[in-house]
Curated annotation (Swiss-Prot):
Recorded family membership: Belongs to the bacterial ribosomal protein bL12 family.
InterPro entries in the cross-refs: Ribosomal_bL12 (IPR000206), Ribosomal_bL12_C (IPR013823), Ribosomal_bL12_C/ClpS-like (IPR014719), Ribosomal_bL12_oligo (IPR008932), Ribosomal_bL12_oligo_N_sf (IPR036235)
UniProt-recorded name of the protein: Large ribosomal subunit protein bL12
UniProt keyword terms in alphabetical order: Ribonucleoprotein, Ribosomal protein
A GO term for molecular function: mRNA binding
A Pfam family the protein falls into: Ribosomal_L12_N
Subunit structure: Homodimer. Part of the ribosomal stalk of the 50S ribosomal subunit. Forms a multimeric L10(L12)X complex, where L10 forms an elongated spine to which 2 to 4 L12 dimers bind in a sequential fashion. Binds GTP-bound translation factors.
Function: Forms part of the ribosomal stalk which helps the ribosome interact with GTP-bound translation factors. Is thus essential for accurate translation.
SUPFAM superfamilies: ClpS-like, Ribosomal protein L7/12, oligomerisation (N-terminal) domain
Organism field: Borreliella burgdorferi (strain ZS7)
GO BP terms: translation
Encoding gene (name): rplL
UniProt entry tagged with the keyword Ribosomal protein: yes
GO cellular component terms attached to this protein's record: cytosolic large ribosomal subunit
Length: 124
């Protein structure tokens, strides 16, 4: 008796996970294929379409505080509204996000403010 596609799908629905894993492994060995190739192709297509969309939200990342740690801490406090201890911890943990989900103009403005007090900043 020959199996058709429906018979195989019915068996797969009731099969245990390890049985399916064993089947996939046997198919890979028998026919010299890998199951990962199909998943990789779909991932490449979706990654390409994501690149074509323009980024609308930006994160301001403090890369380092440079030579003026105190001034950077003061500016981070002013920007974030954090207390002295939290701002100091944030600055010392660089590279660290200062603000996330900003518009491009707001992110660039914060970058300029932080660079004016000696910080090294990136907008991503």
């Amino acid at each position: 008796m020959a199996l058709n596609k429906e018979d195989i799908l019915t068996w797969l629905e009731g099969a245990k996970t390890m049985e399916v894993v064993d089947l996939v492994t046997a198919i890979e060995e028998k026919f010299g294929v890998t199951a990962a190739v199909a998943a990789g192709v779909g991932g490449a297509v979706s990654a390409g379409s994501a690149d074509s969309e323009e980024q609308t939200e930006f994160d301001v990342i403090l890369m380092s505080f440079g030579d003026s740690k105190i001034n950077v801490i003061k500016e981070v406090r002013a920007i974030t509204g954090l207390g002295l201890g939290e701002a100091k911890a944030l600055v010392e943990a660089a590279p660290k996000a200062i603000k996330e989900g900003l518009s491009k103009s707001d992110a660039e403005e914060l970058k300029k403010k932080l660079e004016a007090v000696g910080a090294k900043v990136e907008v991503k």
